[in-house]
Amino acid sequence: MSLHSAIMKLEPIVEVYDNDIGVKLTYNGHNYYGFAYCHKEDKDFFSEKVGATIAHYRAMIKIYDDEIRRAEVAARVLWSAYKDVIYNSQNDGIPVDPTSAFITRVFKARDLVDRYKAQRASLRTQLREYLKNHEKCLESIRAQRKTENEDKNV
């Protein structure tokens, strides 16, 4: 199972604190938290669903951050071992086959890091789009309320 599908299958635990939302995801025995805070000027627009969605995205991004760190460490270890093999083969005079399974593992480890970064970037883009669309919705509601208040005052 890929990391992305594993993250999507996680069951979020949502907690509401006044007008702020917290989401907890448990992945590989670790807890990852995401929070969404409601601005004091937007308290009348508070929505638990919107806050939970934002907090859920943030928790998923934190899982990716952690997995990227782990994958980068593994890739660095493999790359370091490969450089040691190359260095030692130059001293021994024994040629190293660059198509070996080991170098393939090195490149696969690096590819995994790049794939995780692309998926994390996709999640961040989705979150930005969600926030931008939500802000457009709030702006239209504010404008409508402003015109309604002006009509009442006339």
Protein language model annotation of sequence segments:
Residues 150-154:
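Juxtamembrane, membrane-proximal amphipathic segments and lipid-exposed surfaces
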